[in-house]
Amino acid sequence: MTALSDGYVEMGYNIFREFEPHEVDEMMARDHRVSPPRISVNCFLLRGPAGTVLIDCGSGEKFGPTAGKLFENLEAAGVRPEEVDHILLTHCHPDHSCGLTNPVTGERLFANATVIANRKEIEHWYSDAEMQAADERKRLRYFGWAREQVDPYRDGRLRLAEDGEEVLPGITLVECAGHTPGHSTWLLNSEGKQMIVWGDLAHVPEIQVARPEVSMSFDHDPDMAARNRTNLLARIFKQDMLVAGMHIHFPGFGWLVREGTGYRVAIEQWNFEI
């Protein structure tokens, strides 16, 4: 597995739900992090029996000059877009899916890839009723952009998967809804070992891994997100899984260590081959 940086985004205090700025400052300062948070955006590349697999595809041109770096880093890893066989989406928010298409032509950037996503996730973003019920910003940035990115793959290059389904050899969808209705993590099994790519289980690990009850202002169902985060963190810790996170600081690999009533991420040692 290779970590690929899509860059980072600067966020404000308002990304947190019911969490005060001074609390953010205090928790970020413990790890010598800037506050308000700077959030890494990562994607992950797998090469193995299932072919060349990309997990999430970054933000394209949607998030400004500090993000959208996936393609130059994919090239640095020696992979051309047309060589990618499968793209696994954790969910359809812009920083995870807006690298699917060419921003000028609207065509697929991964000409030979099949996109695999949770059925619930795709059905939500293609629900006209849900779109009409959303505010104007969400209609554009979430529903509109999700459809813009996924549409070119609906001609036979989109596969809808279910919770618990082994979508490729050794890769299983583990649903962890709340952040979005079909937010998914990907459980990887190889040679008797497991690791999990946890998507947006934690946007700011310094806070949400230590305090799993803290949700984000843009969570679809904040309470569900907090419950599922709490449960999945406990499972990861109990099973001592290596984790890969889209918003763990690059390269994004780590282990959970118990700290008080929560956890912290112990960053995996740097390794050119993981």
Residue ranges and their predicted role:
Residues K69-E72, C98-G106, W255-L256:
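Metal-dependent catalytic neighborhoods of phosphoester/phosphodiester hydrolases
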Residues F63, H124-S127, P205-V209:
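Short acidic/His/Gly/Ser-rich catalytic and metal-binding motifs that mark active-site loops
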